[in-house]
Amino acid sequence: MNEIKNQIITEKTIRLLQKNQYTFNVDSKLTKTKIKDWIERFFDVKVKSINSLRSPRKKSQKRLPQTSLNDKRMIITLKPEYSIPLFINE
């Protein structure tokens, strides 16, 4: 379960749950197709679509300029007859 880091719970994501959309932070190296296959196998659901976004890199305030990679956030829309449990226990 290293692919999905955590499930995001905010006001916006709770609104998206009504549209059958779930939001996860995932490993930044993964593609949409890999995430889709993994979600369908792990949760036994059918994915309708996936939207992905990355937040800007964080810059350090040290003497030498460095940047760190941020996670990729995926918004996964499921077909109407499927759902995912709200919290993932590790």
Swiss-Prot record:
It is found in: Plastid, Chloroplast. GO terms for molecular function: rRNA binding; structural constituent of ribosome. Keywords: Chloroplast, Plastid, Ribonucleoprotein, Ribosomal protein, RNA-binding, rRNA-binding. GO terms for cellular component: chloroplast; ribonucleoprotein complex; ribosome. Pfam families: Ribosomal_L23 (PF00276). Coiled coil: none annotated. GO terms for biological process: translation. Signal peptide: none annotated. Binds to 23S rRNA. Part of the 50S ribosomal subunit. Belongs to the universal ribosomal protein uL23 family. This is Large ribosomal subunit protein uL23c.
